[in-house]
Amino acid sequence: MSLNPPIFLKRSEENNSKFVETKQSQTTSIASEDPLQNLCLASQEVLQKAQQSGRSKCLKCGGSRMFYCYTCYVPVENVPIEQIPLVKLPLKIDIIKHPNETDGKSTAIHAKLLAPEFVNIYTYPCIPEYEEKDHEVALVFPGPQSISIKDISFHLQKRIQNNVRGKNDDPDKPSFKRKRAEEQEFCDLNDSKCKGTTLKKIIFIDSTWNQTNKIFTDERLQGLLQVELKTRKTCFWRHQKGKPDTFLSTIEAIYYFLVDYHTDILKEKYRGQYDNLLFFYSFMYQLIKNAKCSGDKETGKLTH
């Protein structure tokens, strides 16, 4: 079922501009060695204070959590909602979560917290019906049938044309009506009118890579256009053994897809509009990186 955002999550988008300093060099930072170091982020002071004070209570379920409640999808008591950025997205996002995925380890919750109006999370086997809208939807998942983001518009337009042909093949429909419908609805793939994308929703699977097959092979997802992010590398601290570094965490996949969509499909310069999707992720990444460095230093002292 759809998990709609709580009323109090509908906060002002002014939180973004209040803290964010736009950096003109953002496009070059994406390709840097540490892709998280030059993000245009809202102030993370609220997370720093929460980290120092420790776990806090969820105001909905009463559970003890750090930063946010991963079952209620809300910040905890010591993280004021008004200090959490709100991200506006160009597309709707559906996340299909594996039932055995550990909620506390999932990064999908970050998207729901930061873009509640645009993100829905479903727990498998609950999956929306996409069959009638396969020309408006794409699934981000690697595989031999996957295409790159820049080719999405072309392939979705082909689906529209195939659907039109299928409708006009009705033998009971008078031939002159079929011809007229084709003239009205059919367009050349090279025609400038057809180069815009019809994409309205993107689907992500939230699961360990070893568990994704159960969801991916579900008949309700079969036949959807598949998109793969082939050039991005993960920073995830829970990297799964034996998997390539191009296998991203859920929030990384969402973020990088939107960045590439912005430049390759919308044809606009990227200026950090979606960076706050990594608001929690980048903070946790830095915490773990610092802890690891401190641990390595302590180990070094013991071995000398």
UniProtKB/Swiss-Prot annotation:
Record bears the keyword Transport = no
| One term under GO cellular component | nucleus
Q: Does the keyword Acetylation apply?
A: yes
InterPro entries from the UniProt entry: DTW (IPR005636), tRNA_Mod/Golgi_Maint (IPR051521)
Residue numbers bearing the N-acetylserine modification: 2
A single GO molecular function term of this UniProt record? tRNA-uridine aminocarboxypropyltransferase activity
Entry's Pfam families? DTW (PF03942)
Q: Which GO terms describe its biological process?
A: tRNA modification
Name the top EC class: transferase
Q: Where in the cell is it found?
A: Nucleus
- Motif DXTW, residue range(s) on this chain: 206-209
Using the record, list the residue span of the signal peptide; answer none if the entry has no such feature: none
Look up the EC number in the record and give it: 2.5.1.25
Q: List keywords of the entry alphabetically.
A: Acetylation, Nucleus, S-adenosyl-L-methionine, Transferase, tRNA processing
Q: Which domain of life is it from?
A: Eukaryota
Q: Which reaction does it catalyse?
A: a uridine in tRNA + S-adenosyl-L-methionine = a 3-[(3S)-3-amino-3-carboxypropyl]uridine in tRNA + S-methyl-5'-thioadenosine + H(+)
Function of the molecule: Catalyzes the formation of 3-(3-amino-3-carboxypropyl)uridine (acp3U) at position 20 in the D-loop of several cytoplasmic tRNAs (acp3U(20)).
Output the PANTHER family linked to this UniProt entry.
Answer: NATURAL KILLER CELL-SPECIFIC ANTIGEN KLIP1, TRNA-URIDINE AMINOCARBOXYPROPYLTRANSFERASE 1
Give the family per the record: Belongs to the TDD superfamily. DTWD1 family.
Q: What is this protein called?
A: tRNA-uridine aminocarboxypropyltransferase 1
Species whose genome carries this gene: Pongo abelii (Sumatran orangutan)
Gene encoding the protein: DTWD1
